[in-house]
Every structure is written in structure tokens, then in C-alpha cells.
Amino acid sequence: MALTGFLHGHAAWAASFQFRDFRLLWGSTLLQSLGMGMEHVALGWLVLELTDSPFMVGLASAARMAPFFFLGILSGAVADRVDRRVFLRFLASGAAVIAVLMAALLVTDVARVWHVMALAVAMGCIWAFTMTLRQAYTYDVVGPEYALNGLALNSLSQRVGGVAGALMAGAIIATLGVGAQYLAVSASYLAGGLVLLAVRGVGRAAATEHQPVLRSVVGYVQLIKGNHTLMILMLLAAATEVFGFTHQSLLPVFARDELHVGAVGLGVMSAVRQGGGILGLLLLASLGDFRRKGQVMFAAAVAFGLGLMVFSVATNIFVFVLVLALVNASASVADTLYKTLMQRNVPNEQRGRAMGSWVLSIGTAPAGHIGIGAVAGTLGAPAALLINGGILTFIGVTTALGLPRIRRLS
């Protein structure tokens, strides 16, 4: 009975599961996130083994995220023009093909760093569109009343898949190699796409636009310029991405050079990172459509920064993973509130563009990955996280005090 109630959204924190198409979307996201979790671990470890350079690890993460910045505006414009269900299926197939190509290069032992970088960029292009359309389609399916719950549960599925994927990645890399790892990544992406075939409705999406893409892009720029709330949320999300989320690119360095736990340890660390996010998302989902979202958003961002600073004194694996879990609980809360408030502060027909704004914000990550990699290569990984955490904390405190209108958003 408890399981039935959960699947049909009778529990408060699982309210969005009452919608059939949301349950399918959640399952698809879970499967694709399994692949993404494996891919994140594999990419960092592969580049570190090929180059022995923390900077190159950061550069690889930057290559993976660069398309988010350059395609953020375009993805938002496209999201408001297409059937989001159909396009999500197409994107899942594309991700599976790219993972197979990477596996083929590794299995045949011809992979070079430039191959890895090029395919990382290609995968980033796929995910720039996937993230935009998935967030907008989640809102379509559950509607504004359950938007926060739906987005939190969708992020939860990403985290759960990421935990399982990270643990699997460490074991597969250690036993079968990175080539086999990318075959598993491809299978996960393909399975997620197949689940989407069962999704039926368009939800509460506005009528699909038929104006030229260029005109949609121009309208998007005008939206950002005219909607100050959206612009501020974009900038806050970008700052959190550059100085906060980029900590994950240093996990391979901590695993191998600071904590000496190897590929299996890296998998565990990545799983704990995702697990912390799960705790934060469960808390957020259980709160329902609460007021004072802006205050909670700022508090989570500040906690994120303070947690990163603690990494500089984490000298053993147990302290490290505990802090890692708490940091990512805060990170997941802040990120989900950014997405929710962006969509709640634009008209229905522009929510695709709003999520394109979020993708554009997280597309600033390459600057952060390159920067944190350079600092880590010069001063060490702990110092790099101390600096980034201090900057993020400062931004969170000053903007919370200086932007009362954003702080009062609900």
C-alpha cells in the first residue's frame, strides 16, 4: 500500500507522481542519469590517466560544459517551438551514439586527448538541449501548483541515477576498463529514450511557436533585458556554477593525489556527492509550495560556499565525504530553486526560454573549471576549493542583503 501511494503521489513529497507522464519522465531521467553519472566519473579519470594533469581534467570538464553557454539561448528558443516529448527522444538517441563512438575509440586503443575533448563537446551539445527541454516539460506535465515538487523530484531522479552510475563506474573502470564503461553509458541513454516513447501528452505547454528561430532568439534576448528578476536569477545561478559546482572536476585529483583512494574511491566519492543532493531534494520536495523561496535559495548558496571552504582542512576520506554530502545537499536546494523561480517569473509561453536561461547560466561553468584547474595545478586542490568557497559565500551574503526583492520571492 505504501508503494502504491508513493507511485500515485499520495505522499506529500511525491505529489507529482500522481501524473502518469511524470512517472515515465522520472523513470527516463533516472536511466539517463545513470549513464551521466558513469560518464562524469569516466571522463575525469580517463583524462587524468592520459595527461596526468589536474589542469587538463578541468579543461575536459570545461569542454563538456561549454555548449551549455553557447547553446543556452538557442535551446530556449527551440524548446518553445518543438514538441518537447519528441525532441527529448531524439536527444537520447544522439547521446547513445556518441557514447558508442567513445567506447569504440577506447576499445581499439586509438583514443587521444583530442578525441576525448571533441566527443565531450558533442555530448555537451546534446545535454544543453536535453536539460532545457526536460525542465520545461516537467513544468508542462505537473503544472504551476506542483512545479517545485516536480522539478525537485526530477532532480532527485538525476541524483539517484548519478549515485548508482558513479558506483558502477568505479567498479567497471577498475575491472573492465573505461571502454566497457562507455558501452554501459550508451545502454543507459538508449534505455532512457525508449521509456520516453510511452509518454502521451504535451501537458500544459503553450501553443508551439512557428516564427523563425532567429526571431525567437531576438525575442529571448529582449525577455532577458526586460525581466530583471530573470536576469538576476541567471547571474546568481552562473556564480553558483562557476564557484560552486566546479568542485566536482577536482574529485579525481583528490581521489588519486590527496586521499589516495583510486578509481573505486572516486566512484564512492561521486556517489556520496549525488547522495547529498538526494537528501537536499527530498527535504525540498517534502516542503511543498512553501513561501520565502528566495530566502531559502540564498541560505543554501551561502551554505554551499562555506562547505567548500571546509574542504581545505579535510585530511581524511571520512571527513571529506561527510562534507561532500552536506555541500551537495545545499547545492541541490539552491539549483532547484533557481529553476523554479525562473519559470514562475515568466509567462507560460516563455518557460522554455526561462530554462534556456538556466542552461546559459550553467554554461558559464567552463570558466570555473579552467580557473579551478589552474589554481589547483599551482596551489593545490584544497587551496582552490578554499578560494572558490570564499568567493561564493561572499556573493551569497552580499546579494541576499542587497537584493531584498529577490530575497522575498516565493
Q: Which residues are covered by each model-predicted region?
A:
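Flexible cytoplasmic inter-helical loops of multi-pass small-molecule transporters
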Residues: 2-6, 198-219
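Helix-loop boundary and gating motifs at the non-cytosolic
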Residues: 6-66, 226-273
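Cytoplasm-facing, short amphipathic helices at loop-to-helix transitions on the intracellular side
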Residues: 22, 84, 135, 146-148, ...
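Short hydrophobic/alpha-helical segments at membrane-entry points of transmembrane helices
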Residues: 25, 111-119, 233, 318-324
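Structural signature of transmembrane alpha-helices in multi-pass secondary transporters
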Residues: 32, 64, 154-158, 273, ...
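Core transmembrane helices of Major Facilitator Superfamily
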Residues: 36, 122-134, 327-338
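C-terminal transmembrane bundle of multi-pass solute transporters/carriers
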Residues: 69-74, 81, 85-97, 101, ...
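Hydrophobic alpha-helical transmembrane segments
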Residues: 113-124, 149-204, 269-271, 372, ...
